[in-house]
Amino acid sequence: MGREIKFSLVYRDMWQSSGKYQPRVDQLVRIAPEIINMGCFARVETNGGGFEQVNLLYGENPNKSVRAWTKPFHEAGIQTHMLDRALNGLRMSPVPVDVRKLFYKVKKAQGVDITRCFCGLNDTRNIIDSIKYAKEAGMIAQATMCLTVSKVHTVEYYCNLADELVAGGADEICMKDMAGIGRPVSLGKIVSYIKSKYPNITIQYHGQTGPGFTPASILEVAKAGCDIIDVGMEPLSWGTGHADVIMVREMLKDAGFDVPEINMAAYMRARTLTQEFMDDFLGYYIPESNRRLTSLLIGCGLPGGMMGSLMNDLTTNLESINKSRAKQGKPAYTTDDLMVKMFDEVAYVWPRVGFPPLVTPFSQYVKNLALFNLMQLEKGKERWTMIADNIWDMILGKSGKLPGEVAPELKELAAKQGREFFTGNPQDLYPDKLDEFRKEMDANGWEYGQDDEELFELAMHPEQYRAYKSGKAKADFEADLAAKKAAKANVGSLKPQSLTVDVNGEKYAVTVSYDAPKADAPKAAAAAAPSAPVSGNATDVIAPISGKFFKTKDSSSKAVAIGDMVKEGDIVGYIEAMKVFNAVAAPASGKVVEICRNSGDDVDEDDVLMKIQ
């Protein structure tokens, strides 16, 4: 019998790489026994990035979910692991150091054994801090290398990165091939180097199957000494997900490895339950395109799980772009035309912003920047005229050190806008904030929760936690789901239907129109009405892109109000689109005389947001 290789079921990532939401706690505790009964998993990925936040988004408590979900695996002797984003914790933006420390204490108390900590820039300073905090909390620290392919990201680069992570105290190494574009032979060379130098370090390989390399990569890393392989299972294996455990087991068994048997009766029961969860609500948020493999991803390097959101972004902006082309007497683009242009623009943008590995959140940043550039170019404007604050933070080094050099044109633009590059430790920019959140919880009469887990959720996901506590998150989700179900039902009469949504005992009336893409979301609390229209000459502040309008990015910032004096170029609001806040600048100096939209309102490109006189 050959060397033993173990399997980890990445049940959390199966859902994240396919769609938007995660199963509810009642569903998770139903499927856990069948996953255990399959008898082939040494580990299960239970939570982390894309789990806790998603629970809040549909109005559920993630703390209860994690505790109940990890419990049966502990009882069965199966290790649990989570994904964390190092400096960014469980979100898309940097986290204060005291919140990061509390993060690991809470997750250990909730039953999570291993943290897979990665920095989307592969900045070892961010990862080594996570290693330290995780080990202080009693967790196994699995340091992660985000894999991609560029002139910077060579075999030598990753071997040196592994040396730094081991020296920094890593218990294990994860090879995170999030886009599935790692070349199999090169990955084998990296694993071989690590194992020859650090034979006692556990190596776990995570590869997503979007472009099609993954089975070959699994075989190469296994031959080179990899210990654990991440796998998926039907009906969410393959596509933008992961190789199915059945195939991986048979391939490795044929190669002479010692691999566990699979209880196929339990597999089929788990498969049936997962399909049931999809039919219940999760499937409404899984784009059909995410169920297919496409080697088009090899060239642009974007993770396959982004194809659904990318196609949605392209479709959303296609009409606007074609309007601009029509005004210029140019033929309209098809979605495929726009996708090819988009991939070309990603290839232009990526090296110029320093080759960040294309993983959350930096894959979104590169994709968004490419799309913004494309939209501006089609309107006869210049590149780089729409760069969100989050993207600037990445470019300037506030999230960590970029692997490559930033292009001179962006350095010049930063200087012109008075932006400074940061070369210090990025954590220094984000001081402790737990005391602020404690004050907020005290003021609201909210409990800190077992092991301070409720305090942690507010600190990690402030806006989402507040919406969860108010009931608004649940109401908005229920309304959105009702609209999706109604649209799919394709009722013949096409008459609007009134629904009543019950949220924590409070009833909300929802009107669903079958010819509309979505129903109006019920409001948990009445919002202030926009100001009355003004007469006379005024300059319109126009939405530069479709999305949600917000007066500020967070509750600690002061919103622009009627009567305020602003200067041309001042930030007067934000449009949340494609997972980032895009600043809206005042087009002229003067007094704000009308605010036409409420925070949280959906807006279309070119909608008037406010007026300046």
Question: Whereabouts are the PLM-identified features?
Answer:
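Active-site beta->alpha loop and helix N-cap motifs at the rims of alpha/beta catalytic domains
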Residues: 33, 48-161, 180-183
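Conserved, mostly hydrophobic/aromatic
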Residues: 14, 117, 173, 225, ...
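Core active-site phosphate/anionic-ligand binding loop and the adjoining beta-turn-alpha structural block
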Residues: 216, 241, 249-252, 256-320, ...
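Glycine-rich phosphate-binding active-site loops on the catalytic face of alpha/beta enzymes
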Residues: 177, 224-241
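Terminal or standalone catalytic/regulatory effector modules within metabolic enzymes
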Residues: 36-54, 289-297, 301-527
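Catalytic cores of alpha/beta
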Residues: 157-161, 212-224
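Structured functional modules or segments
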Residues: 533-613
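Hydrophobic faces of well-ordered beta-strands that scaffold small-molecule active sites
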Residues: 6-13, 42-46, 78-85, 115-116, ...
